[in-house]
Amino acid sequence: MATLQGWLQAQMNMNAYFTAINYPVEKHSLMLMAMSDYQSARYGNNFVTGMMMADYGLTPRWTVAIMTEGQKIEGLRTAYGGIHLGTYFHLFRDERLLNLTLYGEYEDLNGAALYKMEIAGIGNGDLTEPLALARKKHVRGFEQRLILYHDWNRLNATFNFIRETVLQAPYGNNYGYALGLFFKSSVMSGSMEGMADMTASPTLSISRLGYGLEIMGALGNNHRFFSNLDAQQHYLGAVLQYIISSHWSLRVEPSIGLSEVSDPFMLRTGLTYMFGPSTSGAMKMDQ
């Protein structure tokens, strides 16, 4: 029973959103994610972006991450976008009404980096210059997030305030946000009933499905903060997460653009593999 409870805690701490961040990864656990977005571009050709991510829990409250991204625009060749190095720290040892986490990320990208890990600043996110020129342009920055979240049993609410500091001329800061509400699957409730559902339910079962909403967008920059929101990108998505096993989960998020410069449609997918003390002890549940 203790092993199962530990697995449930690890799974409950698996973030279901694509842009919003909340829980730290369990201590000594490794979370691997392969994510891909199909975007119906407002300006230019449609494109597909991809990101590979690895998160590791150094302590119960401190997580480090490395991410790399690329993209394929219709009619053009595949291009490498760059690398991200991130870390986030949960400030409180115990649960609070508002659980506070601080996040920092160094970005070493090029002008062809199009994956929407976050949205900040002003204007659209499509590539409007030749790909060959964009790949030669260095884009270095430092992203900071103030993360607040709370769980009411299976219901999670998460908010991220995002600031991106440009580390090269003309410097400056861009701002954004991400907000999510997610209702976890019944097997992740942490209750005796949820644990029974996990051990008894077949691989294909509605009890393994979680669902919610995520909204993310930009808030301007130093000079124009929270003004003319229609000139900034905003998206609303329906989040679906399916717990396949003690190690694997699948996420899908169809999203629509809410402003004149947003891409009209975006389909986000993600496959997650979690390995650590809790999941390795729970492998027998999958057999």
Predicted regions and their residues:
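Transmembrane beta-barrel domains of Gram-negative outer membranes and organellar outer membranes
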Residues: 3-287
